[in-house]
């Protein structure tokens, strides 16, 4: 999809008349007709453009390896996923870890623990630790995006596994990245956060380990997850930066770190779509726009 004047004119026209993304949707449909699917091109597309809602879950499944590139195998692999889900669920029921009234997200957690050999003994069951809470937050958010419980489990499982595998070493460095980019955008706000002692106490776990699950409404969250699933954890930094910039007036009026932490952990749900849009623009500004060709 090389840049050319005719395409740029059409894109500008479509956006002006309210059909932003028409060409991008057509390009994605072409990519989805490939057999086998080109995972790298799908990933680059997802980095560069918003995914249409009608294709989002399918693209996520391919990028996360839930479905293979060969479309001919999708029905068979889907059945394997269903069978495995039912087998693990049945095993947990027999072991009396779950029952009819167990919340679905807790079932996902126990299934995840069983697969990863971290399932505690029934006699040693404890309240969820921080890692469990991160899992449950992501699972609750995914439940709002995906209706089917089998799809939901596999998406949560593979999302978390990929996130840890790809970005585990990068996560501890994201707060420093936030400080750097905030210094580029608003030195005054950064100085206030430092002077108040709030910079070290921002809700980093909510932002960078739960990937904003429980912070942003799902309509905004899924646009952030498009970028994470397709290979960027840096987008999380720019969403955090834009949240701080968007609520600057409120934050500048607070001097207690606890008050700032509480406000950001329970931030207003209005205008989150605009925040995410600005964050993506900021991300492209500093990190560039991946090139993509159909």
Curated annotation (Swiss-Prot):
Query: Which species is the source of this protein?
Result: Danio rerio (Zebrafish)
Every copy of the Rab-GAP TBC domain together lies at: 50-232
Q: Which Gene3D superfamilies match?
A: Ypt/Rab-GAP domain of gyp1p, domain 1, Ypt/Rab-GAP domain of gyp1p, domain 2, Ypt/Rab-GAP domain of gyp1p, domain 3
Q: How does it assemble?
A: Component of the TSC-TBC complex (also named Rhebulator complex), composed of 2 molecules of TSC1, 2 molecules of TSC2 and 1 molecule of TBC1D7.
Under what name is this protein listed?
Answer: TBC1 domain family member 7
Compartments where found: Lysosome membrane; Cytoplasmic vesicle; Cytoplasm, Cytosol
Q: Which UniProt keywords apply?
A: Cytoplasm, Cytoplasmic vesicle, GTPase activation, Lysosome, Membrane
* Biological process per Gene Ontology, one example term: negative regulation of TOR signaling
Q: Which PANTHER family match?
A: TBC1 DOMAIN FAMILY MEMBER 7 (PTHR13530:SF3)
Q: What top-level branch of life does the organism fall under?
A: Eukaryota
Among the GO molecular function terms of this UniProt record, one is: GTPase activator activity
Q: Which GO terms describe its cellular component?
A: cytoplasmic vesicle; cytosol; lysosomal membrane; TSC1-TSC2 complex
What this protein is reported to do is described as: Non-catalytic component of the TSC-TBC complex, a multiprotein complex that acts as a negative regulator of the canonical mTORC1 complex, an evolutionarily conserved central nutrient sensor that stimulates anabolic reactions and macromolecule biosynthesis to promote cellular biomass generation and growth. The TSC-TBC complex acts as a GTPase-activating protein (GAP) for the small GTPase RHEB, a direct activator of the protein kinase activity of mTORC1.
SUPFAM superfamilies the UniProt entry points to: Ypt/Rab-GAP domain of gyp1p
